[in-house]
Amino acid sequence: MSQKQFMQNPWSNWMKGEGPDSDIVISTRLRIARNLRQHPFPLLATDSQAEEVVRKVTEVSDSEAMRKRHQLQVIHMDQINPLEKRVLVEKHLISPHLAEESRKGAVLLREDESVSIMVNEEDHIRIQVLLPGFRLNEAWEIGTKIDDIFEKSLNYAFDETRGYLTSCPTNVGTGIRASVMLHLPALVMTQQISRILQAINQVGLVVRGIYGEGSEALGNLFQLSNQVTLGMSESDILSNLYGVARQIIEQERVARTYLLEHTRVSLEDRIFRSYGILMYARTVESKEAAQRLSDVRLGIDLGIIPNVSPLVLNELLVTTQPGFLQHHAGQKLTPDQRDERRARLIRERLRVVESQE
């Protein structure tokens, strides 16, 4: 896939809407943070030092050992414009930090976008694996094999006592950040979500919005991840996250059953109102779109709205974002223009689906 196609293609592997528990778990993500010994952290590096890190990382990515498993294409942040960077953020392929603050940053992408390797973000290397559904172990297996290939060629910053050294203290140790993106509309509707979020903080996990730290949980989407890596093994981190996520999944299912059994008419009314608005509205702002799409997604998962694939809703999560809308238009848009284009895009996509029924 060409660099241009990564920006224009609305589809990523994680949007498939398949895999274990995919009615609730939109995606699973694993990140591994690594730094190179005798190289300043990216925040302190000069341009030439940062360029040297990119060169070393891309040499390994082009090696026979890596190419046997993954064909990766490098995109340099200083060679793409702000809208293109924003599209990559909205597709969850790079972090806002790499897009906005990194000096001489780059990302290496696999064609199906399930693997992305950020270079010169907060750390020299951040390996990301992003899969559809609840697939922590599979994400770990892919990520650790990539990490092994890098470690054979690069001299990692590692301390026998502390583990892998990272720029952020919360990543020191294993350097692993695992997360699952959960769609929890029923827990929000039944007003149980606050209690659950408070309990999560007490077991070493944290909940953020869909774009990570500081972002809002739009469309009833919550990102659950481990908070620290020091003093815990990789298996401990993954098993703890798996266990808590499994409990939340079951509680969401119980809440959905309750809504169906006790408030079915009002639930269906809410779902079909949102579906109708998305089918016919002429303008829709981003927060409303996220909420309406959440309602429709719930209707699909409960069988209330038939013959619509979750893939369509996952795709719209990205294509209705400001960056993608503007990049697709080929120009910057005012908020009103974005709202109009967003509504038109949703109408067209849903009508294509209806015509295929």
From Swiss-Prot:
Keyword Transport: no
SUPFAM superfamilies on file: Glutamine synthetase/guanido kinase
Residue intervals of the Phosphagen kinase C-terminal domain: 24-255
Transmembrane segments: none
Binding locations of ATP: 27-31, 92, 126, 177-181, 208-213
CDD domains linked to this entry: bacterial_phosphagen_kinase
Keyword match ATP-binding: yes
Pfam families xref list: ATP-gua_Ptrans
GO BP term, pick one: phosphocreatine biosynthetic process
UniProt keywords, alphabetically: Allosteric enzyme, ATP-binding, Kinase, Nucleotide-binding, Transferase
PROSITE patterns xrefs: PHOSPHAGEN_KINASE, PHOSPHAGEN_KINASE_C
GO CC, alphabetical: extracellular space
Reactions mediated catalytically: L-arginyl-[protein] + ATP = N(omega)-phospho-L-arginyl-[protein] + ADP + H(+)
Major enzyme class: transferase
Superkingdom as given in the UniProt entry: Bacteria
Stored HAMAP family: Prot_Arg_kinase
Family membership: Belongs to the ATP:guanido phosphotransferase family.
PANTHER family assigned: ARGININE KINASE 1-RELATED, ARGININE OR CREATINE KINASE
Stated name of the protein: Protein-arginine kinase
Organism encoding this protein: Brevibacillus brevis (strain 47 / JCM 6285 / NBRC 100599)
Annotated gene: mcsB
